[in-house]
Amino acid sequence: MFSRRNLLALGLAATVSAGPCDIYEAGDTPCVAAHSTTRALYSSFSGALYQLQRGSDDTTTTISPLTAGGIADASAQDTFCANTTCLITIIYDQSGNGNHLTQAPPGGFDGPDTDGYDNLASAIGAPVTLNGQKAYGVFMSPGTGYRNNEATGTATGDEAEGMYAVLDGTHYNDACCFDYGNAETSSTDTGAGHMEAIYLGNSTTWGYGAGDGPWIMVDMENNLFSGADEGYNSGDPSISYRFVTAAVKGGADKWAIRGANAASGSLSTYYSGARPDYSGYNPMSKEGAIILGIGGYNSNGAQGTFYEGVMTSGYPSDDTENSVQENIVAAKYVVGSLVSGPSFTSGEVVSLRVTTPGYTTRYIAHTDTTVNTQVVDDDSSTTLKEEASWTVVTGLANSQCFSFESVDTPGSYIRHYNFELLLNANDGTKQFHEDATFCPQAALNGEGTSLRSWSYPTRYFRHYENVLYAASNGGVQTFDSKTSFNNDVSFEIETAFAS
């Protein structure tokens, strides 16, 4: 129950100027960690929200709100990252506890980056506007993860805590585990009840809810719970919102899942009650590390997008969470533009010419299923001209972006598979559609366009030894070489050789 003082404070905190953590503070459940790349989560916060590292020279900078309590300075990011790539290296904790999130280390599973670390996220994969002002979220492909194994002030053992996250309800998969919250400090599986984290996805390996998913569930380690029982719980609905608020809280023999459209409306309670009646979950044995985008022992096959989230000390009341939801809705999250530079038009047929000096007579083509570059001109055979011509269609996974259908093999599209670009028939699956969707941006070398993978926005169409790859600007693969990267990922859009 709230005291008269706290009810007054909560009412004041619900004003437009207050941030989510001001509201939690007024409810006697203060934030112990607060993370966002889009905005300040306290009305007075004016420090760094996140750190960027750019690919051209590996230098770093920090991005702060435009004003105290305001929206991130996206223009500072755009200036710093112009004509190169940028990664998000640190997501800073706004609570003052120093619970910053950095590149997740190896654990029970290795990550795909050097020394088993997880990948870092692209800085431009999740553009949004908040109240009309541009910002960027954290688009996390499989293999991407952030962590802090030495967090301060987070719940341990059976201590009470709450948390929420604003996520993309359309970006998910069924792999383990797109989480945000409390996890093991060793990055290994230390047993049931050692985690308490928000999960969003459509995995049915452990728990699941009504419909086909995705669902908000709670990762308590060795199980995803959608309600009191293992497996199916009908009270946990499928999520269809583009922006979703996921709220979880847990204390001594109680926990809850709540959710809402982050753009409108109020929170609904999907479960509130006793802890699962299975060994290890009552009492809990939480360890207090913080994870984002991965499971507790660095299981890193999941995908999702994160915009903001916090963890609290104490079990927040429904009233407090409801006020936080009002604040999130008032932020007015809207999808931003994924494309820039020379435009494509769905239905047009194009040829794409290499701009790397010494290779400018070569065009993107294919030989059977291999996507490559070949020398093509007006005197080339009809067969080669058709192999070097592509029909532009609306992106199979995202309507802002595009997919490229072969002129000579209708129904087959350029897609990435193990980061090679292949020409494969569209099998109608979600996976294929995501693999075959690419977002054009102004060419990194200033000549034409660069084509960025929608599902792996650190990766671009790149020709390397005359073969096409989905390559990053530096990385563990030979085709990720930084040498000539900007030239190798830039292509001129030309009238097709064939139609």
Curated annotation (Swiss-Prot):
Task performed by this protein: Alpha-L-arabinofuranosidase involved in the degradation of arabinoxylan, a major component of plant hemicellulose. Able to hydrolyze 1,5-, 1,3- and 1,2-alpha-linkages not only in L-arabinofuranosyl oligosaccharides, but also in polysaccharides containing terminal non-reducing L-arabinofuranoses in side chains, like L-arabinan, arabinogalactan and arabinoxylan.
Protein name: Probable alpha-L-arabinofuranosidase B
Keyword Glycoprotein: yes
Keywords, comma-separated and alphabetical: Carbohydrate metabolism, Disulfide bond, Glycoprotein, Glycosidase, Hydrolase, Polysaccharide degradation, Secreted, Signal, Xylan degradation
Site residues, Cis-peptide bond: 176-177
Gene behind the chain: abfB
Chain sites annotated for binding substrate: 219, 222-223, 296, 416, 418-419, 435, 463, 465, 468, 488
InterPro entries assigned: A-L-arabinofuranosidase_B_cat (IPR015289), ABFB (IPR038964), AbfB_ABD (IPR007934), AbfB_ABD_sf (IPR036195), ConA-like_dom_sf (IPR013320)
The protein's annotated pathway: Glycan metabolism; L-arabinan degradation
Signal sequence bounds: 1-17
Glycosylation sites: 83, 202
A GO biological process held by the record: pectin catabolic process
Domain comment in the entry: Organized into two domains: an N-terminal catalytic domain and a C-terminal arabinose-binding domain (ABD).
Source species of the chain: Aspergillus awamori
Localisation per UniProt entry: Secreted
Gene Ontology CC entries for this record: extracellular region
